[in-house]
């Protein structure tokens, strides 16, 4: 009887794992390799350093925003160069450009109330706030 349960439960578990997608705050970027490399170079970050910093294992570290300023400036650079614009001409969030849902807009706005004035830290915080708000919605296709 136990084996029959496994026959039905195992495929269900596999299905759930296949539907689950790992999310990371940097999943928002539509990477252009040249822009990515230029942003790293401008901020004096090697590929190895970036890979170590951007791993899923460092997610709590990122969400606590205890990140060196050069990494925050790299995120600002990526936001400025990304094909999906989140920042207005003044370097501040633009919820219309971000195409947020009402729920995400409220959450992001509340989270950004205590955003730092410094533009690199501000941009980094915006990405973290959007991630916490579940924005953008990742398509399952």
From Swiss-Prot:
One of its GO terms (molecular function) is odorant binding. It comes from the Eukaryota. Gene3D superfamilies: Pheromone/general odorant binding protein domain (1.10.238.20). SUPFAM superfamilies: Insect pheromone/odorant-binding proteins. Disulfide bonds join 39-77, 73-120, 111-129. GO terms for cellular component: extracellular region. Keywords: Disulfide bond, Olfaction, Sensory transduction, Signal, Transport. Residues 1-22 form the signal peptide. One of its GO terms (biological process) is sensory perception of smell. Present in the aqueous fluid surrounding olfactory sensory dendrites and are thought to aid in the capture and transport of hydrophobic odorants into and through this fluid. Belongs to the PBP/GOBP family. This is General odorant-binding protein 57b. The gene is Obp57b.
């Amino acid at each position: 009887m136990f084996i029959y349960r496994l026959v039905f439960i195992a495929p269900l578990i596999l299905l759930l794992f296949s539907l689950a997608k790992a999310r990371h705050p940097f999943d928002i970027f539509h990477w252009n390799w040249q822009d990515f490399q230029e942003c790293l170079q401008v901020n004096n970050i090697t590929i190895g350093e970036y890979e170590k910093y951007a791993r899923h294992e460092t997610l709590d570290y990122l969400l606590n925003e205890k990140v060196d300023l050069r990494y925050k400036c790299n995120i600002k650079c990526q936001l400025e160069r990304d094909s999906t614009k989140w920042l207005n001409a003044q370097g501040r969030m633009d919820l219309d450009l971000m195409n947020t849902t009402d729920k995400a807009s409220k959450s992001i706005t509340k989270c950004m109330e205590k955003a730092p004035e410094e533009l690199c830290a501000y941009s980094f915080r915006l990405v973290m706030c959007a991630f916490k708000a579940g924005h953008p919605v990742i398509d399952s296709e």
